[in-house]
């Protein structure tokens, strides 16, 4: 009986911490990343492709200014795709999902413009049953590339994904990326919506922002060393590993609050490091502190008298 109450309390505490982190994300981080880099005017105005998906349930508009001619930016946009130049994002993460992507660091010669109805591959056609693609719906060369997104090869479209390049003079351009998804009038699917909010949306933002930065780096000819992306992702993986270790420790150790404290710290790091993307030195220091705290979290003694956080000893 005492053990059952103890374990139930520990599970409730962990779920409470997860709910608190999710609440912080939904209240503060999600509204920010849904319009990362975009002005009020850019968020409000129509962009190419909006007409293909009216009345969406969700709209995200992100933007970045690139110090390169619009023609140069477009050249990198039009070779997006696993079948062309990749997505200029976290190649290592993409290939963990069997995408078989190799990001190009140079413009590929003699690429034709995309045509409506063409598949733009997100992963190799040989992976994921050949379903990892979006369909080109509109292509205005030099200006806009709009795709229809699908869940599976035979499924109806679920939204649009648009890339718009606007000149800001001879040597600068604005890249806008807009996603429109779902139907506002559709009946809610709460389980899928929760997954979309807490898993797909933040993951999509992290990858899409890196793609936009990757386009800017290539157009401006200032590519960072390849190890930086790997090191950045490694700090997130370290935070995830510490989160799992602390969670298991909190579930199975009844004596001390330290695993709960480390679980909260690792959860906050896993929430903030990929989303806010601080300088690599800051991310590395945070990850190192979390890893160093793992032995500390396993320490501590049971409080005298039989009562400690996460453990209730019933009287004999």
State the predicted function of each range.
Residues 231-251:
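Selective detector of the "anchor" transmembrane alpha-helix that sits immediately C-terminal
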Residues 181, 185-230:
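A conserved amphipathic terminal alpha-helix motif
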